[in-house]
């Protein structure tokens, strides 16, 4: 057992070696490296696969009951401060290692085909390997210093991947936005880390928890000091995991290549924040104010992400806000003290989201030959529809991931989301209502996304004639009428005219320096198909593999069927102290489970049913009734639906508010400071200098060496002095 643990450091080293090798090759031998691009991709995937098998072995050892293993060595030995580096292997670490490596391998396989046309193919694999290595290093960190270093590397890799197509202004702006937003969180994390070290004198997690709790118990440290440190520390996870109010970077992060959406959403960047809060959970649970703050941040984020996702037209942005909402669930669970439910949802959410993200990439890949390579068209769900008949494998796997995100049994997310909703209801009913409301919204926006993307009729009509396709919540696109009002003032995507276009004119629309133009426009016209085509096997294989954990991973949290039932595998595995102290009766557990599941599944089903009525391919009402209903809704709910749509589509106006307060406010403040510095500070300094200069010039002219000038000055001064004495003689000589 211990022999395999000794090689745990190899897991992050393997992708790091791959990234360094590719980077050095691109720097010193660019032509040779690019000519061997497939070889480098295979090597990167193979090395990460080896790391994945080692991770599975470590996971199996933990399941078998092996104790926590720690390997540490001194990095900076000193009498006052001893900083150690190394790696621990415990249940949470082994879970995250498997998550990161399995999703990383599937993403690399998917990227081999998706990025094959891109000139930055080799560079992409270098960035992806470095990002995976950074996340693996973060996962196995035994102290706050090491975790902070790898956290910064994760942020740097996210900056590189989001801005991969840096020639596009939107991508360049998005990576800067992500980088700056996360720096705000990192500043709070750094202050919190420094405060905890000042209180406890250690960066190691075990020593930190023990000394902090002892200090509180012995009243050696005041809550007025400990609480601010503990409140500053979660700012890092809040920014990294896209929690309100530092969530604004995540939707813009979709400007990067689609394959990176899976590691960003499921296993790399955003999971780092949740992982860090889970690591620090033994410390936070002793501070009620901090736990309450974390729970409310999670609840607000979950509902906000689900609400904003209602009206988004970009397929990848819908998934981004879905990730934000699900991460809010995890943060909510940690805040209410449900460590097991949060860890469970971290596992169960990773695989369905990793399935949906490459699935969206497969959908976009099938749309690009039809509408062109511009993201505004290839990712616009208003131009899709009916794709399931053309891409059946992608459609089936995408539906599976969608149902899991909705929380439909027996898929993965059902088990964990149901537990979070039940625990939040017991902790505080308002949080329980927020969790239930968010579950209904999740069912609505995910099935809205699925219906507009894969059901109905294909709306990107390839005819050269301008044909409008009407997308209404009450009127299917096949039955659009000219009498219907075409505005954006109804429910999400309720009324949008989509003009068709000649795809042959758009086939090279997004052919900047990053995209190979190896196929001429003429050949593109000859090979053009009016309908989307299924992706190749290289892109489909990861989707099929990810369906397995999406179906089965949720059962690790289900108690075994026994007459007297003990703790489930996950509880016993994460921490025996979290297991049920007493045996519970299976019938009682089953009745409670059915009662809770009925509410959560019913709420999600209501959202799914509503989305199916509004956006589904099957008309639920006669055509005349739907037209009359539209007219009635315009008068009754038109204003409200317009406000809701505009608020949701505009991301809650949060970006605009930040732009006014922070960006424009900072610029105005900079101008005021510049004016003050230029005219006040510099004015005083320059005024003193100019006064001295003029004084010197005057003295120089007064001392010219001519006696007549001296005599004139002496007589003038004497006369002035006499006049002063005569005028004020009474004052001087009383």
Curated annotation (Swiss-Prot):
Disulphide linkage map: none
Entry keywords, A to Z: Chloroplast, Membrane, NAD, NADP, Plastid, Plastoquinone, Quinone, Thylakoid, Translocase, Transmembrane, Transmembrane helix, Transport
Disordered, as annotated region: 512-534
GO CC, one annotated term: chloroplast thylakoid membrane
Catalyzed reaction equations: a plastoquinone + NADH + (n+1) H(+)(in) = a plastoquinol + NAD(+) + n H(+)(out); a plastoquinone + NADPH + (n+1) H(+)(in) = a plastoquinol + NADP(+) + n H(+)(out)
Chain segments annotated as transmembrane: 9-29, 40-60, 89-109, 121-140, 144-166, 185-205, 219-239, 258-278, 289-311, 318-338, 395-415, 425-445, 539-559, 601-621, 707-727
Biological process per Gene Ontology, one example term: electron transport coupled proton transport
One Pfam family hit: Proton_antipo_N
Gene Ontology terms for molecular function: NADH dehydrogenase (ubiquinone) activity; quinone binding
Localization in the cell: Plastid, Chloroplast thylakoid membrane
Enzyme Commission number, as recorded: 7.1.1.-
Compositional bias of kind Basic and acidic residues: 524-534
Membrane topology: Multi-pass membrane protein
Top-level taxon of origin: Eukaryota
InterPro entries: NADH_UbQ_OxRdtase_chlpt_su5_C, NADHpl_OxRdtase_5_subgr, ND/Mrp_TM, NU5C-like, Proton_antipo_N
Protein function: NDH shuttles electrons from NAD(P)H:plastoquinone, via FMN and iron-sulfur (Fe-S) centers, to quinones in the photosynthetic chain and possibly in a chloroplast respiratory chain. The immediate electron acceptor for the enzyme in this species is believed to be plastoquinone. Couples the redox reaction to proton translocation, and thus conserves the redox energy in a proton gradient.
Subunit structure: NDH is composed of at least 16 different subunits, 5 of which are encoded in the nucleus.
Entry similarity comment: Belongs to the complex I subunit 5 family.
Record protein name field: NAD(P)H-quinone oxidoreductase subunit 5, chloroplastic
Organism from which the protein derives: Huperzia lucidula (Shining clubmoss)
């Amino acid at each position: 057992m211990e022999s395999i643990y000794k090689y745990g450091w190899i897991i992050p080293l393997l992708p790091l070696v791959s990234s360094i090798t590719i980077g050095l090759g691109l720097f010193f031998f660019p032509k040779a490296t690019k000519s061997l691009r497939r070889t480098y991709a295979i090597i990167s995937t193979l090395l990460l696969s080896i790391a994945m098998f080692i991770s599975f072995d470590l996971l199996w050892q933990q399941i078998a009951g092996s104790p926590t293993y720690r390997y540490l060595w001194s990095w900076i030995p000193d009498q006052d401060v001893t900083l150690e580096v190394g790696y621990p292997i415990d249940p949470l670490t082994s879970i995250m290692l498997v998550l990161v490596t399995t999703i990383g391998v599937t993403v690399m396989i998917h990227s081999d085909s998706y990025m094959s046309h891109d000139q930055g193919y080799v560079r992409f694999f270098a960035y992806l390997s470095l990002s995976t290595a950074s996340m693996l290093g973060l996962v196995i960190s035994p102290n706050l210093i090491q975790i902070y270093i790898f956290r910064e590397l994760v942020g740097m890799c996210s900056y590189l991947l989001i801005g991969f197509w840096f020639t596009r202004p939107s991508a360049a702006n998005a990576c800067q936005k992500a980088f700056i937003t996360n720096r705000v969180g990192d500043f709070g994390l750094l202050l919190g880390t420094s405060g905890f070290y000042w209180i406890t004198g250690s960066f190691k997690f075990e020593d930190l928890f023990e000394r902090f709790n002892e200090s509180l118990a012995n009243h050696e440290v005041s809550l007025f000091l400990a609480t601010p440190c503990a409140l500053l520390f979660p700012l890092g996870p809040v920014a990294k995991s896209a929690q309100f109010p530092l969530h604004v970077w995540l939707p813009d992060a979709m400007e990067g290549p689609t394959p990176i959406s899976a590691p960003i959403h499921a296993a790399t960047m955003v999971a780092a924040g949740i992982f860090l809060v889970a690591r620090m959970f033994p410390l936070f649970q002793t501070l009620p104010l901090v736990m309450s703050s974390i729970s409310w941040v999670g609840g607000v984020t979950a509902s906000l992400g689900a609400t904003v996702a209602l009206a988004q037209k970009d397929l990848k942005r819908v998934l981004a806000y879905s990730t934000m909402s699900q991460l809010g669930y995890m943060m909510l669970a940690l805040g209410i003290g449900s460590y097991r439910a949060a860890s469970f949802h971290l596992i169960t959410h990773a695989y369905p989201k990793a399935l949906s993200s490459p699935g969206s990439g497969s959908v976009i890949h099938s749309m690009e030959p039809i509408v062109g390579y511009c993201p505004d068209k290839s990712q616009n769900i208003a131009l899709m529809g009916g794709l399931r008949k053309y891409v059946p494998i992608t459609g089936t796997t995408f539906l599976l991931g969608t149902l899991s995100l909705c929380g439909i049994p027996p898929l993965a997310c059902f088990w964990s989301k149901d537990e979070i909703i039940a625990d939040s209801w017991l902790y505080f009913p308002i949080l329980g209502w927020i969790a239930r409301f968010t579950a209904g919204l999740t069912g609505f926006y995910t099935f809205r996304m699925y219906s507009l993307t894969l059901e109905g009729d294909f709306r990107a009509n390839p005819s050269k004639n301008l044909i409008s396709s009407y997308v209404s919540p009450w009127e299917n696109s096949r039955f659009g009428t000219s009498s219907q009002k075409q505005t954006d003032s109804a429910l999400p995507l309720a009324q949008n005219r989509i003009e068709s276009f000649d795809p042959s004119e758009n086939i090279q629309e997004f052919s900047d320096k990053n995209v190979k133009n190896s196929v001429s426009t003429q050949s593109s016209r000859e090979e053009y198909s009016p309908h989307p085509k299924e992706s190749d096997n290289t892109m489909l294989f990861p989707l099929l593999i990810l369906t397995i954990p999406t179906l089965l991973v949720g059962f690790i949290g289900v108690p075994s069927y026994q007459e007297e039932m003990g703790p489930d595998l996950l509880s016993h595995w994460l921490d025996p102290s979290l297991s049920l102290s007493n045996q519970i009766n299976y019938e009682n557990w089953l009745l409670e489970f059915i009662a809770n599941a009925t509410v959560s599944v019913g709420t999600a089903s209501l959202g799914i049913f509503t989305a199916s009525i509004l956006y589904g391919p099957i008309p639920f009402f006669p055509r005349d009734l739907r037209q009359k209903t539209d007219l009635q809704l315009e008068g009754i709910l038109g204003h409200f639906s317009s406000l809701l749509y505009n608020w949701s589509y505009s991301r809650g106006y949060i970006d605009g508010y930040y732009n006014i307060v922070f960006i424009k406010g900072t610029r105005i403040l900079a101008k005021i400071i510049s004016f003050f510095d230029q005219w006040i500070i510099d004015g005083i300094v320059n005024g003193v200098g100019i006064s001295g200069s003029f004084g010197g010039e005057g003295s120089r002219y007064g001392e010219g060496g001519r006696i007549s000038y001296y005599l004139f000055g002496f007589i003038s001064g004497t006369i002035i002095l006499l006049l002063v004495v005569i005028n004020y003689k009474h004052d001087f000589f009383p």
